[in-house]
Amino acid sequence: MGRISLIVAALLMLSAISLVTSRYQSRQLFIELGRSQAEARDLDTNWRRLQLERAELARNARIDRAARDDLKMIPIVPDRTLYMNQPAGGAQ
């Protein structure tokens, strides 16, 4: 009878250790899941911000303003356009 009790006690200890280990792993996975979800939210927010920034940078009004203010460009008008004709012999 003592031998059976010892085997049952050992199996009970192994079962308890296995339960503690599985609970610990479950908690670790839950924490990792939370971190991954937070990272996914951050990435989604950054993606939306970048989409808005790209749309802003591609706007024609912004490009026109930058050309006029920063590069000092002016719109072309026909009377200021100079047309150059290539000689009949071609380029040399």
Curated annotation (Swiss-Prot):
According to the UniProt topology, which residue ranges lie Cytoplasmic?
Answer: 1-3
Per the record, its GO cellular-component terms are: cell division site; plasma membrane
Q: Which domain of life is it from?
A: Bacteria
Transmembrane ranges, per UniProt, are 4-21
The record's similarity note reads: Belongs to the FtsL family.
Q: What is this protein called?
A: Cell division protein FtsL
According to its UniProt entry, the function of this protein is described as:
Essential cell division protein. May link together the upstream cell division proteins, which are predominantly cytoplasmic, with the downstream cell division proteins, which are predominantly periplasmic.
Q: Name one GO biological process term.
A: FtsZ-dependent cytokinesis
What is the organism of origin for this protein? Answer: Bordetella pertussis (strain Tohama I / ATCC BAA-589 / NCTC 13251)
| Pfam families attached to this UniProt entry | FtsL
Periplasmic compartment segments: 22-92
Q: What is its main location?
A: membrane
Q: Which UniProt keywords apply?
A: Cell cycle, Cell division, Cell inner membrane, Cell membrane, Membrane, Transmembrane, Transmembrane helix
What's the protein's topology in the membrane? Single-pass type II membrane protein
Q: Report the subcellular localization.
A: Cell inner membrane
UniProt-listed InterPro entries: Cell_div_FtsL
Q: Which residues form a coiled coil?
A: none
Subunit details: Part of a complex composed of FtsB, FtsL and FtsQ.
Name the gene behind this protein.
ftsL
